[in-house]
Amino acid sequence: MAEWHKIIEDISKNNKFEDAAIVDYKTTKNVLAAIPNRTFAKINPGEIIPLITNRNILKPLIGQKYCIVYTNSLMDENTYAMELLTGYAPVSPIVIARTHTALIFLMGKPTTSRRDVYRTCRDHATRVRATGN
C-alpha cells in the first residue's frame, strides 16, 4: 500500500520522533516501510509473532533491542495499542498500534512525552483502519 510510505515520510519530517516502521503482521510479518538504517528497519518475523500472540510479554525484542512493556492492549479491538520504553539508555517511549493488516511502530526521542507518541501513532492507525486496511 502506497500510504505506508506516506505515513513514514510524514513521521520522519517531525522532529519529535526518532524512528518509525510499518510491519505486516497477517501474512509475511516483514517490514513494509521504515526509516532507513534505524532500529525498526531491522525488525524480523521472529520478533512480531510474540507481540501478537503473547499477551503477557514483558521484555520483547524489537529490532534486536530489548524493550519494556508499559501497557499492552495491542489485540484489544477498542484500544489496539501497546506502550513500551526502550530497555537501554537513553530511555525513549515506543508505541505500537495495530491496523487490520499491519503494526505501526513509533519511537519518540528521549525528550518527547509518551502521550505525544501515543496520540500520533493511534491517529495514524485510526486513519488507516477507517480505510479498511
Swiss-Prot record:
Q: Cross-referenced InterPro entries, in alphabetical order?
A: PFN (IPR048278), PFN_euk (IPR005455), PFN_sf (IPR036140), Profilin_CS (IPR027310)
Provide the family line.
Belongs to the profilin family.
What protein is this chain from?
A: Profilin
State the compartments where it is located. Host cytoplasm
In terms of SUPFAM superfamilies, this protein maps to: Profilin (actin-binding protein)
Which organism is this protein's natural source? Vaccinia virus (strain Copenhagen) (VACV)
Q: What GO biological process, any one, is recorded here?
A: symbiont entry into host cell
Q: How does the record describe its quaternary structure? A: Interacts with host TPM1. Interacts with protein A25.
What is the role of the protein in this entry? Participates in either intracellular transport of viral proteins or intercellular spread of the virus. Cellular profilins modulate actin filament dynamics (polymerization and depolymerization) via direct binding to actin through an actin-binding domain as well as by modulation of other actin-binding proteins. In contrast to cellular homologs, the poxvirus profilins seem to bind actin only weakly.
UniProt entry tagged with the keyword Ligase:
no
Q: Please give the GO cellular component terms listed in this UniProt entry.
A: host cell; host cell cytoplasm
Keyword line: Actin-binding, Actin-dependent inwards viral transport, Cytoplasmic inwards viral transport, Host cytoplasm, Host-virus interaction, Virus entry into host cell
Cysteine-cysteine disulfides: none
Q: Which GO terms fall under molecular function for this chain's record?
A: actin binding
